[in-house]
């Protein structure tokens, strides 16, 4: 049984993970961290990770970027692997995570959905082929409570396309003013509204035809399942930086 410390247990994803974990025989939430603890979680909840005094096997983080330092500190003190699912990190924080992973076990992914990661691998294969004759745009949609924009997944997918193309690629965040699209631009557009769980639409627009590669998350359970899968995967791994490709064997 993998015992999980869930940081951000009171949020939408934390709630989804807690509920889904009840269906697992080989993983459970042993403790949670949230600034506004709820009383009906079924496990002890602490206001800060430094206060946690329950034995756990792995830290699962679905909180905010400003929690990173205390998570890394606790991980180092307790010698626990970390599964980082939070998005919106600064470049400096990403560098800190990469450096930390040289001596600690860290999993990090911008999206825990199996489907999104399959889409990402498809983009690795087709982007360089399509780029010559197709313009590329990306539209992402999320609920009105999401704080980072564009989404971490949108940036993940855009970076995959960019890295597959040999030319210099520029990102354009939204469009305004009077100017034509340059071929080496990828337009990234964010929509926020209602309770949209998550949609990412990759548009390859050519002369006379358009190709769309789209992923729609209909439930947060797809992210919760991937998160629990990552926790079980990483528990016996050595120091290094892991992602969903490792979990899925892709």
Curated annotation (Swiss-Prot):
(S)-2,3,4,5-tetrahydrodipicolinate binds at residues 143, 152-153. GO terms for cellular component: cytosol. Keywords: Amino-acid biosynthesis, Cytoplasm, Diaminopimelate biosynthesis, Lysine biosynthesis, NAD, NADP, Oxidoreductase. It comes from the Bacteria. It is found in: Cytoplasm. The keyword Oxidoreductase applies. The keyword Amino-acid biosynthesis applies. NADP(+) binds at residue 35. It is an enzyme of class 1 (oxidoreductase). Pathway: Amino-acid biosynthesis; L-lysine biosynthesis via DAP pathway; (S)-tetrahydrodipicolinate from L-aspartate: step 4/4. GO terms for biological process: diaminopimelate biosynthetic process; lysine biosynthetic process via diaminopimelate. One of its GO terms (molecular function) is NADP binding. Its EC number is 1.17.1.8. InterPro entries: DapB_C, DapB_N, DapB_N_CS, DHDPR_bac, NAD(P)-bd_dom_sf. The active site is at residues 142, 146. NAD(+) binds at residues 8-13, 34, 85-87, 109-112. Its main location: cytoplasm. It catalyses: (S)-2,3,4,5-tetrahydrodipicolinate + NAD(+) + H2O = (2S,4S)-4-hydroxy-2,3,4,5-tetrahydrodipicolinate + NADH + H(+); (S)-2,3,4,5-tetrahydrodipicolinate + NADP(+) + H2O = (2S,4S)-4-hydroxy-2,3,4,5-tetrahydrodipicolinate + NADPH + H(+). Belongs to the DapB family. Catalyzes the conversion of 4-hydroxy-tetrahydrodipicolinate (HTPA) to tetrahydrodipicolinate. This is 4-hydroxy-tetrahydrodipicolinate reductase. The gene is dapB.
